[in-house]
Amino acid sequence: MKFKHTSVLLHETIDNLKPKNDGLYVDATFGGGGHAKYLLSKIDTGTLIGFDQDEYAIKSAELNFANLLKPDSEPKLQLVHDNFSNLEENLVKLGYTDGIDGIYYDLGVSSPQFDQADRGFSYRYNARLDMRMNQDQDLDAYQLVNTLSQKELADILYQYGDEKFSRQIAHKIVEKRKEKPIVTTFELVDIIKDAIPAYARRTGGHPAKKSFQALRVAVNHELDVLQASLEEAIKVLRPGGRISVITFQSHEDKIVKKIFKKYSEVEVPRGMPFIPDDMKPTLKLVNRKPIVASDSELENNNRSHSAKLRVAEKL
């Protein structure tokens, strides 16, 4: 079973964690294990805990990393089939209550998820409207498209996809579903194309790209779980521990930037002679500006074009 995926900003993400040989680390988005493989090569006696809510990714990892999953393995890998928003709860279940030395995130959908036609993530393949990263979840894209109000649909398309024709698309969806339910990705693609003016369809890539992105974000509550997970990650990091986050969309990057700022900057009331301990920053930024892919990586990995890496350290 292969979950082939080319990791973006591989060395930058892991090297900025400054891995320790005996450290305890978390891969919040295990996927194909590209970042994990590189980190494990840096920790001789340490442990990596890999999270993924996609059962297919976990099963693939169990085969591809079988030797490192043995109890006496050094370094050791442990896998968790759950969303990274449940970080602290799962660490406690595994017996890790003293914090971690580092954590990293590679956000968004992986290449294998896009390429699995039946998952319904891609507008390039005809499949049932699904888009669930966790197949045990009830809510899927079919439900959103066929049950939300026109305003709710328009808000999702605009807020999560920056789709400037969100109202027109939402209106067309509601009109079409009156005739019959919208079941497949290609049905939705045709509706989107029909809603967007001809001049706009000729530029800016595939006309359904932004709408599919927005629905995926909504189905998986991606922004809410990201914020919750980052808060927990900062809490469980040991002093000196680091957090690396790769984002691909502006709304993801805004959340990371906002939370890093929240914990690294302090507003001290004027005239206060000292900063109380509970007001002191708990993070320091390792890089003020996001790290982006090198020219070489941009040439070899198209997915890296929109990637931004932010790194912070626990004080």
UniProtKB/Swiss-Prot annotation:
Binding annotation for S-adenosyl-L-methionine: 33-35, 52, 84, 106, 113
Enzyme class, broadest EC rank: transferase
One GO biological process term: rRNA base methylation
TM regions (residue ranges): none
A GO MF label: rRNA (cytosine-N4-)-methyltransferase activity
EC annotation from Swiss-Prot or TrEMBL: 2.1.1.199
Function, in words: Specifically methylates the N4 position of cytidine in position 1402 (C1402) of 16S rRNA.
Protein family (similarity comment): Belongs to the methyltransferase superfamily. RsmH family.
Cited PANTHER family: 12S RRNA N4-METHYLCYTIDINE METHYLTRANSFERASE (PTHR11265:SF0), S-ADENOSYL-METHYLTRANSFERASE MRAW (PTHR11265)
Name the UniProt record assigns to this protein: Ribosomal RNA small subunit methyltransferase H
Gene that produces this protein: rsmH
